[in-house]
């Protein structure tokens, strides 16, 4: 895994140096501007969670798989041993005191990795799981908030779609209020006209009654004035005679 990182970093550095022009000591001119390209709409493949397999902590497994069809199972080891012996025989690499120091350091590092590596890996995995759990919780919270916002928006859209019912209700209420006002005013006019007609009828009845009383009084007055004293005496005498006759008839009838 470490070799892949080193090789990729070296390839990136080489390509950047190849495409750059020297302006001065320690100064490079960039030939392209970063973060200005058009975004790709294709789906980005997910990054691997774990790295590829390596042998001896440095050599990728793909190197052995590449040489197996051509050299067999022992081919990569023979090739590596031959390269080491070639470098030593041609004095490309000379063994010195630093070589033993490097071997000692490498041995200590390998021992530390073998002994404490799993515990450190478990601790790192726990930290990673905690971070993933926090991110997942934040993601679920965000999804829930967005879902709530979507539900609220849908409810608001439903209310907006049904607002014409509110307009119809308000229109009907206004029509009913106008109808009630119209009927109240019509009843007020009816009462006013009825009161005026009743007043005129009362006035007419009063005038007719007064006219009748005046006529009766006038006739009675003239009748009384037309009766003489002799006629009055005769009438009184006739009334007394009639009363006496009625009294005799009443006495002649047996009492039941």
From Swiss-Prot:
The name this protein goes by in its record: ATP synthase peripheral stalk subunit b, mitochondrial
Q: Which locations, inside or outside the cell, does it occupy?
A: Mitochondrion; Mitochondrion inner membrane
The alphabetized UniProt keywords are: Acetylation, CF(0), Hydrogen ion transport, Ion transport, Membrane, Mitochondrion, Mitochondrion inner membrane, Transit peptide, Transport
What Pfam families does the annotation carry? Answer: Mt_ATP-synt_B
**Member of which family?**
Belongs to the eukaryotic ATPase B chain family.
Cite the InterPro entries for this sequence: ATP_synth_Bsub_B/MI25 (IPR008688), ATP_synth_F0_suB (IPR013837)
Gene Ontology molecular functions: proton-transporting ATP synthase activity, rotational mechanism
A GO term from the CC aspect: proton-transporting ATP synthase complex
Instruction: Spell out which residues are annotated as carrying N6-acetyllysine.
Output: 139, 154, 162, 221, 233, 244
Q: What does the subunit section of this Swiss-Prot or TrEMBL entry state?
A: Component of the ATP synthase complex composed at least of ATP5F1A/subunit alpha, ATP5F1B/subunit beta, ATP5MC1/subunit c (homooctomer), MT-ATP6/subunit a, MT-ATP8/subunit 8, ATP5ME/subunit e, ATP5MF/subunit f, ATP5MG/subunit g, ATP5MK/subunit k, ATP5MJ/subunit j, ATP5F1C/subunit gamma, ATP5F1D/subunit delta, ATP5F1E/subunit epsilon, ATP5PF/subunit F6, ATP5PB/subunit b, ATP5PD/subunit d, ATP5PO/subunit OSCP.
């Amino acid at each position: 895994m470490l070799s892949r990182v080193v090789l990729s970093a070296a390839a990136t550095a080489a390509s950047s140096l190849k495409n750059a022009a020297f302006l001065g000591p320690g100064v490079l001119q960039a030939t392209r501007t970063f973060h200005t390209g058009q975004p790709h709409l294709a789906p980005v493949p997910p990054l691997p969670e774990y790295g590829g397999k390596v042998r001896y902590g440095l050599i990728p497994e793909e190197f052995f798989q590449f040489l197996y069809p051509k050299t067999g199972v022992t081919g990569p080891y023979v090739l590596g041993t031959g390269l080491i012996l070639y470098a030593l025989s041609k004095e490309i690499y000379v063994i010195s005191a630093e070589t033993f120091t490097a071997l000692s350091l490498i041995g200590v590092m390998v021992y530390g990795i073998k002994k404490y590596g799993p515990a450190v890996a478990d601790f790192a995995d726990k930290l990673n799981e905690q971070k993933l759990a926090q991110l997942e919780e934040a993601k679920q919270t965000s999804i829930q908030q967005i879902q709530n916002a979507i539900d609220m928006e849908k409810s608001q859209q439903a209310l907006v779609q049904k607002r014409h019912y509110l307009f119809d209700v308000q229109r009907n209420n206004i029509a009913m209020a106008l109808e009630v006002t119209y009927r109240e005013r019509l009843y007020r006019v009816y009462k006013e006209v009825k009161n005026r007609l009743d007043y005129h009828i009362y006035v007419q009845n009063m005038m007719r009654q007064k006219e009748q009383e005046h006529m009766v009084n006038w006739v009675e007055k003239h009748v009384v004035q037309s009766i003489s004293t002799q006629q009055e005496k005769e009438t009184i005498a006739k009334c007394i005679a009639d009363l006496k006759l009625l009294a005799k008839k009443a006495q002649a009838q047996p009492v039941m």
